[in-house]
């Protein structure tokens, strides 16, 4: 099974970088990165120390519903290139482990699919989840704070 790590869509990110409202209808906050743990969800790279970044509320689901978690994410304030077609875990996945959880075509959690997975086992876990017909896509989330990192899809 071939998988790919998927970043946020460029059209959504550009709107936010231009001051558009986040999931709560608020403009993104602008901060200066200290270079420690500021993962951009568009280029899937860490935001360098001294660079301006955005912090905002994001809902990585098409519609609000009980399982549509909304939470804080970081983006480069300046336009960056979207990471496309990555088959290996991106640079931003540099913690020891992450929550890896499957979602159905209805954008709801598939119960029993989630777990805290060592970073070096994320690809294998995603491939195993995709053997199930009820898994449409997978989220990678922070194991400490549940923050959305990226999506994994079948390639």
Stretch-by-stretch model annotation:
Residues 101-137, 141, 154:
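Short, hydrophobic/π-rich interface segment
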């Amino acid at each position: 099974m071939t998988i790919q790590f998927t970043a946020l869509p460029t059209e959504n990110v550009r709107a936010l970088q231009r001051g558009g409202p986040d999931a709560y209808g608020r403009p993104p906050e602008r901060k200066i990165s200290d270079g420690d743990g500021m993962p951009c969800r568009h280029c899937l790279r860490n935001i360098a120390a001294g660079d301006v970044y955005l912090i905002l509320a994001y809902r990585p689901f098409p519609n609000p519903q009980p399982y549509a978690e909304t939470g804080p994410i970081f983006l480069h304030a300046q336009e960056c290139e979207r990471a496309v077609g990555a088959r290996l875990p991106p640079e931003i996945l540099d913690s020891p482990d992450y929550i890896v959880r499957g979602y159905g075509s209805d954008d709801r959690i598939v119960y029993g699919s989630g777990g805290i997975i060592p970073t070096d086992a994320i690809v294998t876990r995603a491939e195993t989840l995709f053997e199930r017909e009820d898994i449409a896509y997978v989220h990678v989330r922070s194991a400490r704070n549940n923050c959305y990192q990226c999506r994994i899809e079948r390639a």
